[in-house]
Amino acid sequence: MAITAQMVKELREKTGAGMMDCKKALTETNGDMEKAIDWLREKGIAKAAKKADRIAAEGMAYIAVEGNTAVILEVNSETDFVAKNEAFQTLVKELAAHLLKQKPASLDEALGQTMDNGSTVQDYINEAIAKIGEKITLRRFAVVNKADGETFGAYLHMGGRIGVLTLLAGNASEDVAKDVAMHIAALHPKYVSRDDVPQEEIAHEREVLKQQALNEGKPEKIVEKMVEGRLNKFYEDVCLLEQAFVKNPDVTVRQYVESNGATVKQFIRYEVGEGLEKRQDNFAEEVMSQVRKQ
């Protein structure tokens, strides 16, 4: 297939590799983005894919907690102007209150539910769109329940650019649970522990690391040992409990949590716009579009 400049740009953003290397990788893999990432890694050109695709959409993540129930949600807007608008932020908080109270099981169920004001959730969002003049969407949410004795940790970074909700069992204080949430916001782990990593992901990583070592010219008899060592580094990248604790790098998150008599049961991390693309307006046009609405 034809390799476009946009494909090369996307691969560069995902791997940090040079333009010509990205073009060659895409050519060698017939334009398959994931295989091109693996090709670059196997050649030692890229260490790993960046942890998130380009983040471009605007909006806000928010967390609400009441008793033994918590909700984390993401609401998207088209521009940062609207995301910082008081009316938009009020909408997000009212949606959070509804989700916390009604505990819908899916997005479709949530949008069809009736709010305390008599409107359905979807109609309420549509009314906000009409007033604000910009597309607004409830993108995702999760309702989490805890048992007595368990602890929620909630952390919002940069006014809701990133939201993290943690659930700890044991004797953890809210401060400990929040510290873990702050760590997750900064380090972006995918899983709690090694046990949570899917076997197919481990097998894929093992094969990439093996090819990487062979391409470095290492003797085959020591390749397996190298792979196991590098696999440990992979676990440190993706598993929360394996990571050096951001507030005290001398201990792992596991050691920090256990020293406080707790264990991590679950976490949810929302970063606004993950995987979404924003309209290609430039900043001047964005300003003008808002001025015209005044």
From Swiss-Prot:
Q: Does the keyword Nuclease apply?
A: no
| A Pfam entry, by short name | EF_TS
As one GO molecular function, the record gives: translation elongation factor activity
Question: InterPro entries attached here?
Answer: EF-Ts_dimer_sf (IPR036402), Transl_elong_EFTs/EF1B (IPR001816), Transl_elong_EFTs/EF1B_dimer (IPR014039), Transl_elong_Ts_CS (IPR018101), UBA-like_sf (IPR009060)
Keywords, in A-Z order = Cytoplasm, Elongation factor, Protein biosynthesis
Q: Where is this region: Involved in Mg(2+) ion dislocation from EF-Tu?
A: 79-82
Top-rank taxon, per record: Bacteria
Family of this protein: Belongs to the EF-Ts family.
Question: What's the stated role of this polypeptide?
Answer: Associates with the EF-Tu.GDP complex and induces the exchange of GDP to GTP. It remains bound to the aminoacyl-tRNA.EF-Tu.GTP complex up to the GTP hydrolysis stage on the ribosome.
Under HAMAP family, the record lists: EF_Ts
Q: What is this protein called?
A: Elongation factor Ts
* Species, as recorded: Geobacillus kaustophilus (strain HTA426)
Gene name of the encoded protein: tsf
